[in-house]
Amino acid sequence: NGQLWRPLPSDLEMRSHYENRYGADFIPDDLNVQDWGVTYDELEPHFDFYERICGTSGTAGQMADGPREGGNPFEGPRSADYPNPPMRQPIGPTKFGEAAQKLGYHPFPLPAANATKEYTNPYGAKLHPCTYCGFCERFGCGYYAKADPIICVYDQIKSHENFEIRYQAQVLRVEKSEDGKTATGVTYLTDAGEEVFQPADIVCMNAYGLWNVHLMLVSGLGKPYDPKTRTGTVGRNYAYQTMAGVNVFFDDQVVTNPFMGAGALGTVIDDFNGDNFDHSDLGFLGGGYIACTQTNGRPINYQPTPEGTPAWGADWKRAVRENYLHHASLTVHGSSMATPDNYLDLDPTWKDAYGRPLLRMTFNFPENDRRMADYVMGKAHEIARNMENVTSTSASNRAAEGSDYSIVPYQTTHNTGGTVMGTDPTTSVVNRFGQMWDHHNVFVFGAGLFPQNLGYNPTGPLMGVAYWTLDHMKNDYITNPRPLMDA
């Protein structure tokens, strides 16, 4: 959709931060909370660069020389403002912001990789201003207003002589040297069914986070995590996103026009994210942002009805018709703490089309996250009830007590962990530079690096780390290949 967040400085040093603020015994033993091994200040130049690659729109809340009005007061200091001004806010998010402000909270426009003016990024890619067409969410942008890897990067580098993409190539495994200390390349399958070995001095694991874990496990890279002994690292600390929300229905005086939407259009508060609020007596770690967003009013997908409406029939049709123009949605986008019992491994029975064991996911919501979601959802519901012209509200919590995680209802695609970064090889797959402890010429990218998941969408943090890794690979490793940290 284009939500583009930076992590809070405390997010990247979570264990150290909570122990320093609340004491060494505050974090329970059933949570694998870890520091990332890299700080906000180290990543800030890379966050800034990536925001410029995407033509990000927003309002800065904290600059290096002090706070700014209208932005997120809890964010880390920025070296530069967003490259584009914030998006224009529709009725629903505006009313949410007004109610939040009256309650003493700090609303600001959602940071968006949706351009708000003509823009040329550092690679020379041109973006156009968003038209609020309502077909951004779950789709590409035909108007070139939403940041996209093809638009923002690929089109600018595809003609480089030292760049090539092998299309229709399925990587089957990473090959290792005889002593197992380095990778020698990858073996992939062509669309003609031919196995090809591609030698490489450096192997970058650039698949989606889950598939990086799978490829490592089937290739024998690193040490697989064993939940019984709690040893090994590949597949450890799998985490997700903890979602809740509130539906808000207005009287006929408020017309929200939901069909005028964009991927990352909305107003947010960060007052209950991370450790932006006192956790002393709450019984949980983490938090989440609360946002009122307006992405689309597509009739097959968007059918808001008040609580108690029948699921079908004439009364359902009447409720859809009467409420289509008078509805807003609040989202609680919560963190997800890693636990010893949530992990990824190879399935002992099922195999894929290439004869490899499938990846198996073992996950349920930790009690910590259930309590967090219930608390922050209560704050969202409080704001909803204080919005003007509201006739009814209804809340939902995917992590409610008594409900197990289900992969069936869409929540997010924010799968994290399994290839965690850090400074301790017994609890991380890669070091602080994204380099594998066990195979120094293998570098790993993506949200699999997160030791636990934040209350934000993962794109901004993972790309900040990606540019940090590339910087050290290019300027430190290539000239002298070696482990960049001692194990």
Regions found by a protein language model. Give the residues of each.
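Conserved redox-cofactor binding core of oxidoreductases
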Residues: 19-168, 411
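Conserved, non-catalytic sequence blocks in retroelement Pol enzymes and Pol-derived host proteins
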Residues: 86-88, 144, 367-371, 409, ...
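Glycine-rich loop(s) and the adjacent beta-strand/alpha-helix scaffold that form part
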Residues: 159-160, 169, 173-177, 181, ...
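FAD cofactor-binding and catalytic pocket of flavoenzymes
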Residues: 1, 7-20, 24-27, 32-40, ...
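A generic secondary-structure signal for well-formed alpha-helical elements
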Residues: 7-12, 16, 47-61, 100, ...
